[in-house]
Amino acid sequence: MKKHLITGLFAALALSASAQSFKEWLDPEVNAVNRAPMHTNYFAYESADVATRGLKEQSSRFMTLNGIWKFFWVKDADARPTDFWRVGYNDKGWNDIPVPGVWELNGFGDPIYVNIGYAWRNQFQNNPPQVPVENNHVGSYRREITVPADWKNKDIIAHFGSVTSNMYLWVNGRYVGYSEDSKLEAEFDLTPYLKPGQKNLIAFQVFRWCDGTYLEDQDFFRYSGVGRDCYLYARDKKRIQDIRVTPDLDADYRNGSLRVQLDVKGGGNVSLELLDAAGKQVATAAAKGSGTALINVENPHKWTAETPYLYTLRATLQGSSEVIPVKVGFRKIELKGEQILVNGHPVLFKGANRHEMDPDGGYVISRERMLQDIQVMKQFNLNAVRTCHYPDNNLWYDLCDQYGIYVVAEANIESHGMGYGEQTLAKRDDYRKAHLERNQRNVQRSFNHPSIIFWSLGNEAGYGPNFEAAYDWVKAEDPSRACQYEQAGKTGKTDIYCPMYYGYEGCRKYCEDASMTKPLIQCEYAHAMGNSEGGFKEYWDLVRKYPKYQGGFIWDFVDQSPRWTGKNGKMIYAYGGDFNRFDASDVNFCDNGLISPDRVPNPHMYEVGRIYQDIWTTPADLENGEKIG
């Protein structure tokens, strides 16, 4: 009998080891294995009282995976350990690394900064979906955790907020799944793998580059590892799986409505309660299982960047203790004539492009840093941000909802290094799924944020049928918002003409051309490197003269340099060329910001703050003492 048990154990281990092909990282048509479907960003609390506090970390249904993990780093992908996920594997000689944390700022490899082109450009010729093996660093992670015993009858979900460039996951020696798309969360149902009340081994492996890296050629420092929070959470077996809220206003922009779409696992009635900012009940509704409910509200407070009033919608499934709070704002986005309207009024978008970049954490951005960024934006009259060029941390959208920042929410697509011609990935069938999936997941996850006014399909990735398919899907899925893409130009599938670095004369001619009916909002302009922002006033003279010209997004908000120890032992903010002589580098082009890495305004930020100001006065007749108006 003992021999049979041992034989069965080895057979089970062999089955687990062979469940993944290890070809996923080079297959553009396999972007996930066993990854849970994307849903809107919410947390299901165990009671209304805990839900009111709105801090998932205080919930008994939450368990953080942040902290110190055992870590093993190799320079080349073919040197990676292949059995490290086994329960009895000896990791005593491994290093420690924080999660979240990027490798290069924790002593493993050097940061790479390139603008156009891939980080491997000095060693490897582009050949999608193939990526290098040499210098393709791989990090392997292990950690033992004890899952709460009272989660035994729950479904247990793992949330990995952002992992670059991919991840393979094992639990207790069993293969769970795989995920790509570095800037959106990967969730996995771990219920069949975990043992509540006991120690459990979680192991995952991350490659610096995979086939998806061809879609992540953004102009920023290239780091690897875990960039956002990771945690487990417990759900009832019978539950609200997804909840989407679409606000609207009537033709007079007075009365409001909320269209609530529900996906319920296991069926049952859902009660909906709308609370104002003071916690007072405003309206209620009910829904039978999966479907749609409509909530009408007479003359609600309206959400704008100037008046970011938020209500709370609470959803509870009958027979379940779970309470899901969703922040909602009543606002209406319209494309009328040649303008974008918010609540019936044209808006001037005084924006900037913002990379998620911290001088000490790289991709790891604290709440305090995000609040600092919003404070600076408000101080200098910015009212809009483009999430260049990928979805941001969920918390960033929450804060934009709360403090009032219009958001252009961009999908994680840029393939600039492949060019815009026939070789563009936008025209390749094998990358069609990835283009579509990254846009779908972006919309599915961030749907409920009132601050999001446009979806953006990506950046500098050519144009072709893959983007046309993505546009069609986004517009069908969410007709309440505009959708833009720069490479679609004036006549392609984009609701907004959103060029980059369009000159003064080009802007003027577009505004005076009656055949051009799309709003003009530059997705990038006024490049803020060095002694810059000359001519910015002239741009805004046009914006304030021509109704169809509604502003733009400066490149870019913050200098990207990491804090580094220089050769003389002193602290520096490092450029792309400061680390070694063999990696690709576009040197100091990483610092194009309105503010420095530590968020001190650069001199040209003061010029921007003045031109972006909301209130302008002009003397009517000083000689006769007329009032300034």
What are these regions, as identified by a protein language model?
Residues 1-22:
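Bacterial Sec-dependent N-terminal signal peptides
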Residues 176-177, 282, 347:
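Short hydrophobic beta-strand segments in globular cytosolic domains
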Residues 24, 55, 70-74, 105, ...:
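Accessory beta-strand-rich segments of carbohydrate-active enzymes
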Residues 20-57, 108, 124, 211-214, ...:
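Extended substrate-binding grooves/exosites of carbohydrate-active enzymes
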Residues 160, 258-266, 344, 628:
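Aromatic/hydrophobic beta-strand junction motif of beta-rich domains
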Residues 195-197, 263-334:
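Extended acidic/polar, glycine-enriched regions
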Residues 170-176, 275-277, 318, 343:
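Short strand-turn-strand beta-turns centered on an Asx-Gly dipeptide
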